[in-house]
């Protein structure tokens, strides 16, 4: 589809993105009053319906407080924001924020290591077999892009084996962002060099070796972080 033919984002979505950036960048700081709704709608050239849709999304994210008959106020996103804020912080004004990305990759390494240890303790025989199969598929993947899809499937299976709902939901919440920017988040660049670590992790989980699983996945995630940083230069 040509750029000319690409569907335009709804007005409410564009306004939401503009207001969100204003809050996250500090243009509207914690405790600040937002302009009246009619003024915001007029300045943005949108209907009140579109404005209210945008404001509702910000309120649901915990970033503004809307009270009937009172001024709308900005909340401190560091205190009230959730995982859904990360994606917007990571891609500020369309460009990748290297500081936020570094934090994300650091947290990813820590999370996946503990996820592997739990999986080694709690996995079922079927889940262990699934991890071994996925590790083998990654080694045989035709290219890095195919390996990246398998990588996500491997960690989804690891989360299921860990039997921890929070880890499962975290992966669900980042899936869309992960694949939308897969080329920049090149965690499986030169995937055949990484393949032995998937195999080592799968074997450790199968053998219920918590320490071995944690070490293999931590080393894998650290190397993946290097791949991303190399790609970004």
Regions found by a protein language model. Name each.
Residues 24, 28, 116, 120, ...:
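Short, flexible helix-adjacent loops and helix caps
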Residues 155-156, 169-233:
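C-terminal all-alpha effector/ligand-binding and dimerization domain
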């Amino acid at each position: 589809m040509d750029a000319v033919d690409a569907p335009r984002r709804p007005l409410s979505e564009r306004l939401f993105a503009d207001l969100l950036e204003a809050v996250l960048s500090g243009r509207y700081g914690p405790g600040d009053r937002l302009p009246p709704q009619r003024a915001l709608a007029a300045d943005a050239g949108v209907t009140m319906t579109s404005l209210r849709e945008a404001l509702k999304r910000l309120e649901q994210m915990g970033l503004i407080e809307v009270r009937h008959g009172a001024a709308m106020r900005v909340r401190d996103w560091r205190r009230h924001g959730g995982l859904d804020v990360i994606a917007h912080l990571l891609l500020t004004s369309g460009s990748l924020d290297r500081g936020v990305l570094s934090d994300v990759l650091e947290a990813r390494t820590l999370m996946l290591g503990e996820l592997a240890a739990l999986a080694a303790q709690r996995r079922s025989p079927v889940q262990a077999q699934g991890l071994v199969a996925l590790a083998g598929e990654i080694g045989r993947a035709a290219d890095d892009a195919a390996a990246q899809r398998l990588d996500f499937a491997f960690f989804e299976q690891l989360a299921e084996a860990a039997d921890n709902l929070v880890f499962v939901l975290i992966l669900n919440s980042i899936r869309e962002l992960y694949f939308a920017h897969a080329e920049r988040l090149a965690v499986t660049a030169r995937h055949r060099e990484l393949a032995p670590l998937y195999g080592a992790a799968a074997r450790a989980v199968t053998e219920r070796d918590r320490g071995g699983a944690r070490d293999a996945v931590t080393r894998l995630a650290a190397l993946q972080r290097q791949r991303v940083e190399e790609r970004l230069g």
